[in-house]
Amino acid sequence: MNENYLGTMSMGIKAPILKEGDPIIDIVVNSVLEATNNQLKDKDVIGITESLVARSLGEYVTIDDIVNWIQIYMGFEKTITVVNPIYSRNRFAMILKAIARAAKDVIIYMPDVDEVGNVRENHPFTGLDYCKYYKQIVNDEGTFCKIIKKDGRKLISGGDKTDVIYCGLHDYEQYKNTYITLSDICNDKCDFGLLGSNKSSEEKLKLFPSSKLSQNFVEEVQKRLNDITGVNVEVMIYGDGCFKDPIGGIWEFADPVVSPGFTKGLNGTPNEIKIKAFADDKYDNLNGDKLTDAIINEIQNKQSDLKGNMNSQGTTPRRYVDLLGSLMDLTSGSGDKGTPIVLVRNYFKNFSNF
């Protein structure tokens, strides 16, 4: 391949199937070096899926861990109101199972569509009626369940904080002083609590990796790779990529953040000009090499901060880690590809420096 013609490349890297206690840093470093024949480049970006990190480092809670937390902090034999859960077998069913096991009765407020776009009944991809599904989960624990098909945020007010669990994924901060949120439950094990957790088995959930653990992890991977190769790469842990399905309308963002840990070179946002806008407007009279030279000159001499400048209109000035997280999540997939590590190359290059 002629790298003078290649821009950003995103490549999935195979890794062994890890279990708790496996030496994940060694495995990540060795997998990257094997895949690249030890030919890393400065500013390559290495992404590791949050699941790989959490599973290998034992970031789990059991259903009974959650039950114990609820009964200690909310009380025994309570009627617990569950407000606006996500509609997901993977993300919420096990949490609801624990709530039902801990409570006397459960009331669930369920709006037509959940926070990330899943519909309550006749889901377009799973075919599930989540009212029936969630009610069955509660009943299977021997607990009474009442479903209210409304947005609970508009209806609950006052009362005892220990009666309500607010299940919002991204607006929970505004309710933390009023109700228990998913971020509160079992947050002694992870600073995100149950936010971003996944079903691991019928009695266990995998937690989203904590901020401190994640930061230590990415910095150690970066150091190891630099020690071996002399190359300075960037490293991040990524979860859901935040892209939105245009057909189902589902927002792929059931985690609390896209990246719980990343090296300092990934701070910031792109600072770009719109090439086609310059080609069609300012340099409409140029062609060929003269047009190319003019555009390269614009890129090389652009302001260091184009925020609010019309030259940057339409250039997607979002955070690097959010943009890269989307790219990595789509590259690695969520099923059986077996590539939980992603290498992104040339991400920080532009038209002027290939």
How would you label these PLM feature ranges?
Residues N2-D42, S51-F354:
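Conserved mixed alpha/beta catalytic, RNA-binding, or beta-rich assembly cores of soluble enzyme
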